[in-house]
């Protein structure tokens, strides 16, 4: 069986599971869709605890990235974390395995995939791209067989090429970015974008239908975004917004 068929078969199994009903609470004037990419994961437990306290379910895009513990985010040591998130009703999607970046389409059915900052790169054909997108899902499924996985993917940095989008569609996956006001800013420099400023901006700008993006922790940010995350959640709820996981076909962004 090819890796492409394996991916499509795995997604079919995921989609055959009952979808979690999402009923908007009274007073909800529209949904927002919180998505979390893996990242450095330093604040992962803190963020997960906040989500749990407020009953927020998110869509988690997984890649095998280096973490603050010296391992990688889809190594066996992280299995308890991912199992707990699946049990809480969060849903999952692929963020590529290596978290490299798409840099161009050198030929039809080919896409250049390069490590951040240069250095290693390779040209992926259709089968290799499907395998790159399938691998994090396969690793997650081994750790958390009950995890609900959506037929979506997110390119690292949100950077795509026309070829990568077409080829991923052939793997059965639709790309999911984030909306203009959904970039929460946890990757920005703390000196230029302190938490207080990010909180004010996000509470003022985010409205119904936004797809939000953040990480389980960002290595280069000295002022952890997790310090204001609970205030952001409660502030958005106070404005009548309700958190939902992404639908299977994604949301325009």
Predicted stretch roles:
Residues 22-110, 117-121, 132-151:
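Active-site beta->alpha N-cap acidic-glycine motif
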Residues 159-205, 241-252:
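His/Asp/Glu-enriched short active-site or ligand-binding loop at hydrolase and phosphoryl-transfer sites
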Residues 1-13:
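N-terminal secretory signal peptides and thylakoid transit peptides that target proteins
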Residues 35, 61-63, 93-95, 153-156, ...:
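A cross-family glycoside hydrolase active-site/sugar-binding cleft signature
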Residues 22-28, 53-54, 58, 221-253:
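C-terminal domain-boundary segment and adjacent tail
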Residues 37, 51, 156, 212, ...:
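Divalent metal-coordination and catalytic microenvironments
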Residues 14-18:
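N-terminal signal peptide c-region/cleavage motif recognized by signal peptidases
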Residues 38-43, 64-77, 100-103, 152-162, ...:
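Acidic-and-aromatic substrate-binding clefts and catalytic sites of carbohydrate-active enzymes
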């Amino acid at each position: 069986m090819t890796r492409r068929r394996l991916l499509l078969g795995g997604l079919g199994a995921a989609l055959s599971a009952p979808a979690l009903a999402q009923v908007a609470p009274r007073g909800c004037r529209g949904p927002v869709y919180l998505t979390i990419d893996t990242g450095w994961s330093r604040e992962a437990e803190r963020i997960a605890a906040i989500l749990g306290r407020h009953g927020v379910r998110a869509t988690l895009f997984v890649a095998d990235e280096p973490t603050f513990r010296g391992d990688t985010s889809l190594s066996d040591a992280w299995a308890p974390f991912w199992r707990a998130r699946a049990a809480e009703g969060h849903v999952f999607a692929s963020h590529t395995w290596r978290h490299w970046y798409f840099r161009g389409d050198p030929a039809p059915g080919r896409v250049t995939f390069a490590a951040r900052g240069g250095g290693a790169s390779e040209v992926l054909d259709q089968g290799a791209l499907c395998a790159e997108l399938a691998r994090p899902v396969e690793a997650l499924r081994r750790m958390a067989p009950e995890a609900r996985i959506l037929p979506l993917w997110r390119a690292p940095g949100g950077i795509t090429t026309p070829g990568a989008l077409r080829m991923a569609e052939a793997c059965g996956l639709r790309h999911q970015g984030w909306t203009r006001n959904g970039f929460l800013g946890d990757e920005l420099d703390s000196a230029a974008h302190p938490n207080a400023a990010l909180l004010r901006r996000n509470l003022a700008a985010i409205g119904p239908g936004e797809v939000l993006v953040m990480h389980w922790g960002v290595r280069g940010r000295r002022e952890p975004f997790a310090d204001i995350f609970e205030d952001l959640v409660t502030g958005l709820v106070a404005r009548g917004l309700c958190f939902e996981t992404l639908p299977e076909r994604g949301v325009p962004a």
